Design a protein with these regions (language model features):
Chain C
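Hydrophobic alpha-helical transmembrane segments of multi-pass integral membrane proteins
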Residues: 1-485
Length: 208, 296, 485
C-alpha cells in the first residue's frame, strides 16, 4: 500500500512546480461501515430528539402529544373552558347568542350542522375553515370562515370549544373528547385549504 | 468525476436538499405562523409594540446590542406540582391517598393538608409520577391537578418564567435574538427591571448602577447641556465622578428614551402552548378585568 | 487508474501566470488590507470589553458596530476576495488555461471592494441589518452580487475552457463553492434583508447562510487549497481520490445544516438535524485529514518550509473546528457552551485558523510566481507566520476555555451574573486581546510584504509612466523581470 502511495518517479525528477496528481486507490471498507453506523445513529437521534419535526415542539418536550398533555388546566371542566375560547375566538362573528348575523355568519344555536351525532365535520370546519355555499336549517348561506387550527393550537382547547358549541343555547349533542380532536387534526390539520360544504357532507359525522 | 455536467447536477441536487431542509421547511412551519389567542390573557398574542418602542428597537439594532445580549430564555426540563383543589366528600380515603402520593407526610400532616384544600400536596415530580398520582385520585371524588413548572438555569436565575418560543418574535423585524451572553439575557427585562431611570443611568454609564460592569458606556445617546434656570425634569441624577461639570446637566436624547421604551416592552410573562406553565392571577395586573369577566 | 498530470516545467507556467498578474495582485493587496482593517476593528472591540470607556463617545465605534464590521471585513473583504484570487489561480494551473477576460475581473474586483467598503461604513453608521454574517446594509448587497457575477462568471468560463479535461479533486471543491455562494447569498439577501421572512424563520435561514458560507464556500476553498498545495509542496500525488470524493459529497450535502446548536428559540428538530449533520461533517473532515496524512506520510523535506507551516496550521485548525463543533452540538454540551465565548472561539479557529492560514499560504506561495518577483524579506514572512499563528491560537484557546467557564457559570443559577463576567471570563478576554494584537501585527506585516512585492513588480511600469524611467536600477529590474521565470 505505502509503496503505491510513494511518488511514481517518471524519467526525470519531479520539477519544483509540478501540479499534483491523484491516485484512485480502493476505498477501505471501514469507511462504509462507519458511514452506515453514523447514518443509523443519526436516524435514532432524530427519532428521539427531533420532536417529530413538529413546529410546536420546543426544548425539553419530546413530542406534540407531551406538550398537549402538560397544558395547565387540562383537568378543568371542558365546557367552561370552551366558553372562554368561544368568547375570544368565535364570538365576534357568531355572537354571544350563537345566532350569527343574517347574510353573514350562520347560526350555531339549533344548527343541524352542529347537532350531529359526532363532531367530525365541525372539527374540520374549525381546523381548516369553510368556503362557499352551504345550507343550514334549510337556509342558504355563502360565506367564508377562516382556518383556526393554528389559533386554537391545543387539542384540549379544540375539543373544549366544540363541546361548548354542541351543548349551549339548547344544543344537546355529545361532548367532543381531546382524542377525537387529535385524530381529526392528525388527518386534516395540514390540509392547507378550506372545506366546501359538499366535501364535508361526503364525510361521516362520527370521528373514525 | 471528470464530467462538468455530472458535477453540476450533483451540486444542484445538494443545493435543492439544503434549500428544502433549512429554508423551505422552516418557512412552511414557522414563517406562516400567526398570532394566537392565549386563554390566560384573553387576547391575541403577541401584540405589536408601540411606536416609540419600535424606534427603540432600531436604536438597539444600530448600536449592536445583540452582540452582547441575548433575548432567548432556555428551558432544560419540567416538573409538576400536585395540587389538591377540592377534597370532595370522601375525606378519609382522600387523606389516605394523599399519604400515598407523598410518603413523607404523617397522617396528621395529611389531614391538615386536606382541610386546607386547595393546597399543594407534593412538589417537583416527574411526569410518570404525576400521571400515577392523577390516576390514584381518579375515582376518589377529589379534584387533583398537575401544575407544570419549567426548569432550567435561565429560569431559576429569574430571567423569565418560561422559555421563549417562535410565537414571541412574530412581530420583530429584524430578529435581534443575539447569541452571546456577555451581558444578561433581555427577553423579559421589561418585567424584571421596570425602573426607567435605572435604564437611563445604565446606558449613560453602566458603572453608575452596576459596579465593575464591562458594558461600554453610551454617552452619545445623551446630551450634556447647560442648566437653563431650573434643572430639566429629565436630567439624570449623576453623582461623583459621573456628574457633569458645574452648571451642566445630562438629559436623554429621544434615542435614549425610545431605547428604554423598547427595553421596557420586552416581556415574556404569559404561557403559550409550546411553553406552558401555571399562570397566576397576580401576574396579569392589566388583564384583571378580563379575568373577572370569565368568572360569569 | 492513476491520473498523473503531465509535469510541465516551470518555464511553461509563465504565460499562464502572467495573464493573471495584475488582477491577482489587486485582489490580494485589497484582501490583506481588509484583513488589517478587520483585525483593527476586532482589536478595538476586544479592548472595549475590559475598558468600557475606550472610544465610548462615538457611535461609529461601539462594541456592537465593531464586532460585525470586523467579521464582515474579514469574511467578505479578506477571505472571499483572497479566496477568489486563490481559486482562479488553481483553476488556471490545474486546467492549464490562461485567464479569460482579465479586464472584467479587474472591474469585478473593484466593484466588490466598493461594495464591501459601502457595507462596512454602513454598519458603522448604524445601518446594520442585525443578521449574523450578513450585517452589511441592504444597499451594499447588490453591488457584491453584481461583482460576484463578473468574478464567478470569469472563473466558470476559465474552468470551462480548460485544456486538461481530467478534474483534480480540488477542482470539484472550487466548482461547488463557485455555485454555492451566489445561491446562498442571493437567497439570504432576499429572505432576510430584501423581503424578510417572519419571525424565527430568520434565525434558521441566517444559520443556514452562515453554515453554508463557513463550511461550503470558504471551507471548500480552504480544502481545495490544502489538497492542492500540500501534495504540491511535498512533491507527491494525493493519496486517494475516492476519499476526497466521499468527503466532498458529505460536506456538500450536510455542510450547510451544521452549526446551529440546539437550545435556541427554535423547534427542537432544527437543533437535532443540525447536530446530526455536524457529526457527519466532522467525519468527512477526519477522512480528508487522513487522506492528506497518507499523502505526506514518510515524505522528505517540503519544498517550502514556511508555506507548509501555514498549511499545517490550516489543516489542524479546520479539523479542530469541525470536531469541536460536532462535540459542542450534543445537547448536554450545548447547554453549557451555547451563548458563550466558545462560539467566537470556534469562529476564530474556522475563519482565521483554517481559511485564513490557508489563504495566507496561497498568497505566500503564488504571488511570487504570478508577479515574477520574489519576496524581498523571507524573515518578515517568518515573523508574519509566527505572530499570526500565535495570535490566532491565543484568541481561539482563550475563547474556547473562557467560553467553557462562562457556560459553567451560566448554568449555575446561584452564581451572580457579574461574578461570571468579572471573575470568570475577564482574564480570558485579556488573553484574547493580546492575541488580537498579535494578529493585527501579523496583518500589518502582511500588508507591508504584499505592498513591497506590488511596488517591486510595478515600480518600473509606474515610473515609466511618470516619466521617471532611466534611473539605473529600476529599469534594470523591469528588464530582468521580463526575462525571468
Amino acid at each position: 500500500m505505502s509503496a503505491k502511495s510513494k511518488k511514481n518517479t517518471p524519467k526525470k525528477k519531479h520539477a519544483e512546480d509540478r501540479e499534483p496528481g491523484f491516485h484512485n486507490a480502493p476505498v477501505p471498507v471501514i469507511l462504509f461501515v462507519i458511514a452506515i453506523l453514523l447514518a443509523y445513529w443519526g436516524m435514532n437521534y432524530l427519532n428521539t430528539n427531533a420532536g417529530g419535526f413538529n413546529r410546536y415542539v420546543y426544548g425539553p418536550y419530546n413530542s406534540y402529544e407531551v406538550v398537549a398533555d402538560v397544558q395547565p388546566g387540562s383537568g378543568d371542566d371542558p365546557i367552561k373552558r370552551g366558553a372562554d375560547i368561544y368568547r375570544n375566538v368565535c364570538l365576534p362573528c357568531h355572537q354571544a347568542s350563537g345566532m350569527g348575523a343574517p347574510g353573514q355568519f350562520p347560526p350555531l344555536a339549533g344548527s343541524d350542522w352542529v347537532n350531529t351525532d359526532g363532531p367530525n365535520r365541525i372539527l374540520r370546519i374549525v381546523l381548516n375553515g369553510l368556503n362557499g355555499p352551504m345550507e343550514v336549517n334549510g337556509q342558504s348561506w355563502n360565506a367564508a370562515m377562516p382556518p383556526l387550527g393554528d389559533v386554537i393550537a391545543s387539542d384540549a382547547d379544540l375539543a373544549a370549544v366544540v363541546s361548548y358549541i354542541r351543548n349551549t343555547w339548547g344544543n344537546e349533542a355529545s361532548i367532543c373528547t381531546p382524542e377525537e380532536a387529535a385524530a381529526v387534526r392528525a388527518e386534516s390539520g395540514d390540509r392547507g385549504r378550506s372545506w366546501s360544504a359538499a366535501e364535508l357532507l361526503a364525510l361521516p359525522v362520527e370521528v373514525q | 468525476m471528470n464530467q462538468g455536467p455530472t458535477l453540476f447536477l450533483g451540486v444542484l441536487c445538494a443545493m435543492a436538499v439544503s434549500w428544502i431542509g433549512f429554508v423551505m421547511l422552516p418557512q412552511v412551519q414557522l414563517g406562516s405562523q400567526s398570532t394566537r389567542v392565549v386563554k390566560e390573557l384573553g387576547r391575541h398574542y403577541p401584540s405589536p409594540r408601540g411606536g416609540l418602542a419600535e424606534r427603540g428597537k432600531d436604536v438597539y439594532r444600530a448600536a449592536g446590542c445583540a452582540s452582547c445580549h441575548t433575548q432567548q430564555i432556555r428551558q432544560t426540563g419540567f416538573e409538576f406540582d400536585m395540587v389538591l383543589n377540592d377534597a370532595g366528600d370522601f375525606t378519609n380515603s382522600v387523606i389516605a391517598l394523599v399519604q400515598q402520593a407523598n410518603r413523607s407526610l404523617s397522617e396528621q400532616e395529611a389531614t391538615d393538608l386536606v382541610a386546607k384544600a386547595p393546597i399543594t400536596i407534593r412538589e417537583g415530580v416527574k411526569k410518570e409520577m404525576a400521571d400515577h398520582i392523577l390516576k390514584l385520585f381518579k375515582d376518589s371524588g377529589a379534584k387533583v391537578a398537575a401544575n407544570i413548572r419549567p426548569l432550567g438555569p435561565d429560569i431559576e436565575r429569574g430571567w423569565g418564567p418560561r422559555q421563549t418560543v417562535g410565537l414571541d418574535y412574530l412581530y420583530d423585524q429584524p430578529l435581534l435574538l443575539g447569541n452571546q451572553r456577555i451581558g444578561p439575557d433581555l427577553a423579559n427585562v421589561g418585567s424584571r427591571l421596570t425602573d426607567r431611570e435605572w435604564h437611563l443611568l445604565h446606558l449613560y454609564h453602566p458603572h453608575t448602577v452596576v459596579a465593575g460592569s464591562i458594558m461600554p458606556a453610551y454617552p452619545y445617546l445623551f446630551e450634556t447641556q447647560e442648566i437653563d434656570g431650573e434643572p430639566s425634569p429629565d436630567a439624570l441624577p449623576l453623582e461623583g465622578e459621573f456628574a457633569p461639570a458645574e452648571g451642566m446637566e445630562v438629559v436623554p436624547k429621544p434615542e435614549a428614551n425610545s431605547l428604554v421604551d423598547y427595553l421596557l416592552s420586552l416581556r415574556i410573562d404569559n404561557p403559550v402552548f409550546e411553553a406552558p406553565y401555571l399562570f397566576t392571577q397576580a401576574e396579569s395586573s392589566e388583564d384583571n378585568n378580563s379575568e373577572t369577566e370569565q368568572a360569569q | 487508474m492513476d491520473a498523473n498530470q503531465s509535469s510541465k516545467s516551470p518555464s511553461d507556467w509563465s504565460d499562464i501566470d502572467r495573464s493573471y498578474r495584475f488582477p491577482t495582485l489587486f485582489l490580494a493587496s485589497k484582501a490583506v488590507t481588509w484583513l488589517l482593517l478587520g483585525s483593527i476593528f476586532s482589536l478595538i472591540a476586544s479592548i472595549k470589553m475590559h475598558s468600557p470607556t475606550f472610544l465610548a463617545s462615538c457611535s461609529w465605534v461601539t462594541y456592537g458596530t465593531m464586532v460585525p464590521a470586523a467579521l464582515n471585513a474579514v469574511v467578505y473583504g479578506f477571505a472571499l476576495q483572497a479566496g477568489f484570487a486563490a481559486l482562479l489561480w488553481m483553476t488556471m494551473r490545474m486546467g492549464q488555461v490562461k485567464l479569460v477576460a482579465p479586464g472584467y475581473l479587474y472591474i469585478g474586483a473593484t466593484l466588490w471592494n466598493i461594495g464591501v467598503l459601502v457595507g462596512i461604513v454602513g454598519i458603522m453608521a448604524g445601518h446594520s441589518t442585525g443578521m449574523a454574517y450578513l450585517e452589511m446594509p441592504g444597499y451594499a448587497l447588490p453591488m457584491l452580487f453584481a461583482a460576484y457575477t463578473l468574478i464567478g462568471g470569469i472563473a466558470l468560463v476559465t474552468f470551462h475552457k480548460r485544456q486538461v479535461r481530467d478534474l483534480y479533486p480540488s477542482q470539484w471543491f472550487i466548482f461547488a463553492a463557485l455555485f454555492w455562494f451566489p445561491w446562498i447569498f442571493s437567497a439570504a439577501s432576499c429572505l432576510l434583508v430584501g423581503s424578510p421572512v417572519r419571525g424565527v424563520t430568520q434565525v434558521v435561514i441566517d444559520g443556514w447562510y452562515a453554515s453554508g458560507l463557513n463550511v461550503v464556500v470558504l471551507g471548500f476553498i480552504g480544502i481545495a487549497l490544502l489538497q492542492y498545495l500540500i501534495p504540491k509542496l511535498a512533491k507527491r500525488d494525493l493519496y486517494n481520490g475516492y476519499l476526497s470524493m466521499f468527503a466532498f459529497w458529505v460536506l456538500l450535502i450536510f455542510g450547510s445544516f451544521a452549526g446551529i446548536l440546539p437550545g435556541q428559540t427554535l423547534p427542537s428538530w432544527v437543533g437535532a438535524l443540525s447536530t446530526v449533520c455536524s457529526v457527519f461533517v466532522a467525519f468527512a473532515w477526519i477522512v480528508l485529514a487522513y487522506n492528506i496524512y497518507r499523502t505526506i506520510e514518510g515524505g522528505g523535506a517540503k519544498s517550502d518550509a514556511l508555506g507548509i507551516k501555514f498549511l499545517y496550521l490550516s489543516l489542524a485548525s479546520g479539523l479542530a473546528a469541525a470536531l469541536l463543533t460536532a462535540w459542542a452540538s450534543r445537547e448536554t454540551i450545548a447547554e453549557v457552551v451555547q451563548f458563550t465565548l466558545f462560539l467566537p472561539g470556534l469562529k476564530w479557529l474556522q475563519l482565521y485558523g483554517f481559511v485564513g492560514a490557508g489563504l495566507l499560504a496561497a498568497i505566500y506561495l503564488f504571488l511570487p510566481k504570478v508577479s515574477g518577483t520574489q519576496w524581498s524579506s523571507p524573515g518578515r514572512w517568518t515573523a508574519t507566520f509566527w505572530t499570526y499563528a500565535v495570535g490566532v491560537l491565543l484568541v481561539a484557546v482563550a475563547f474556547l476555555f473562557g467560553g467553557w467557564k462562562h457556560g459553567k457559570g451560566l448554568t449555575n443559577p446561584d452564581m451572580p451574573f457579574m461574578d461570571i463576567v468579572r471573575g470568570g471570563i475577564a482574564p480570558f478576554i485579556r488573553m484574547s486581546t493580546v492575541g488580537e494584537l498579535l494578529v493585527t501585527i501579523a496583518a500589518l506585516l502582511l500588508v507591508w510584504n504584499v505592498s513591497c512585492l506590488f511596488w517591486r513588480t510595478y515600480s518600473g511600469c509606474l515610473l515609466n509612466c511618470c516619466g521617471l524611467a532611466g534611473q539605473g536600477g529600476d529599469s534594470g529590474k523591469s528588464q530582468s523581470k521580463k526575462g525571468s521565470k
